[in-house]
């Protein structure tokens, strides 16, 4: 005879890193608390809401950034904990217990990271309002607020939603915008995926990153990191902690604990600094070009002569200018780049030589 176990439904499109981490956080709570829950989640980790009220079980943890899920759960008579982004207006929150990623803290972390690097021009690459991504609208709002408070000039480009049929057009428009930005601008992208668009366009336009433009994303999405030549700095969300807190709160609701409507904001974990914001305040065009060449080719066995050929000036001239701007010789910088690349690979990859 089976003892009574709570049946819990998770409604997430866990084909995305953020959603997967929330689900992992739920699992971590189950392991820590030894809760006897039967978890239902679709085998392909996609949220399906057809006839949802017929199979919800005893409680729900759901992605309330998804408007369709939020609407489908209206008037459902089981305990619900919503998970999603924070809002600057209290009335924007859904009328359920809610665990939120702190959008203000996410954008502020990226902004402060760029400031610490010496950047004093800022831009934001978001998503169009037609995308329906409310968290993107909130992050853009935070960016505008931060640059206004700090008396900086901030530029916003929402861009286009991308699909195979409009990909090249969207990238061309992004290229047009990037070419209007002054050198030494720091760009905060609303997600890592949008940041990758920027890195691709910069590579095509031969805009050196981070020497001329710095780029930072949000999500710390590993897949994006491996798909870009320039390693992307990113703000890691506290998604696992969100899942953990959501499960903990649902447990209290299942135990019939009386409480007011809960809204819990979860801060980001930290900024993961990588090459895309490894900014040095360089002003000499020849040194900027040399640094960019070294960063992209140091591990290909290049020597000082190859750097000179790429820049097109004499050794004595470039060595003098390089020493004045960077404080190192060209040879020393090539060696330092090799060591940094090796260190980064040791930390971040899991490849085994068979």
Where are these regions (language model features)?
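Bacterial carbohydrate/catabolite-sensing allosteric modules
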Residues: 1-59, 69-310, 319, 324, ...
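Key DNA-contact positions within bacterial/archaeal DNA-binding proteins
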Residues: 316
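Sequence-specific DNA-binding recognition helix
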Residues: 349-354
